[in-house]
A protein has these predicted regions:
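Bacterial N-terminal signal peptides that target proteins for export
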Residues: 2-16
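Extracytosolic low-complexity repeat regions of secreted or lipid-anchored proteins
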Residues: 91-155
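C-terminal motif of bacterial Sec signal peptides marking the signal peptidase cleavage site
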Residues: 23-27
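A short, surface-exposed helix-loop junction/capping segment
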Residues: 28-34
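Sequence contexts marking disulfide-bonded cysteines in secreted/extracellular proteins
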Residues: 29, 43-45, 81-84, 93-95, ...
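Mature extracytoplasmic domains of secretory-pathway proteins
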Residues: 62-114
């Protein structure tokens, strides 16, 4: 009799464990990210080969895109996308970070950094939870450097 209770208890424990695992898997949502028009370009394939393994100690997260030109790290997600049109002249601040020019555009919930003088452009969205946001940009230097610098530079 006790044997039946034990095996029923073991089955119940196994079922509950499986339900918890499935629930956790279903709870894993991916970050919604739009794929830029030039994401499939040779330049973006080259840049994507240099995405950082971690950003500020944060590991990669799943995104809604299967494109290698789109990547996310951390929660809230730090998002990088390659394949955007190049940024034209702007009054937004322009920063030189380790030889890579970035235009910083303040958003309500963080900062959008876009490479300047590179075609196609790379965009990095940094939520305000990661202040000061520019400190994360060195992680993207190798990816940005994979796209040649054009004539435009930060002043």
């Amino acid at each position: 009799m006790r044997r039946g209770i034990t095996s029923r208890g073991a089955r119940l424990s196994a079922c509950l464990g499986a339900i918890l695992i499935v629930g956790e898997l279903l709870g894993c949502s991916s970050t919604e990210v739009a794929v830029p028009a030039d994401a499939g370009s040779a330049a973006c394939r080259s840049a994507a080969a240099h995405w950082p393994k971690t950003v500020g100690g944060h590991r990669p997260q799943q995104t809604s895109s299967s494109s290698a030109a789109v990547r996310a790290w951390g929660d809230p997600a730090i998002i990088a996308r390659c394949g955007l049109p190049p940024t034209g002249p702007t009054t937004d601040p322009c920063l030189d970070v380790s030889g890579i020019d970035w235009v910083a555009h303040q958003l309500t919930d963080g900062v959008r950094f876009t490479t300047y003088g590179r075609t196609p452009a790379i965009e990095v969205l940094v939520p305000s939870a990661y202040k000061p946001e520019p400190l994360l940009l060195p992680a993207f230097g190798a990816a940005a450097a994979a796209i040649p610098q054009g004539e435009r530079r930060c002043l």
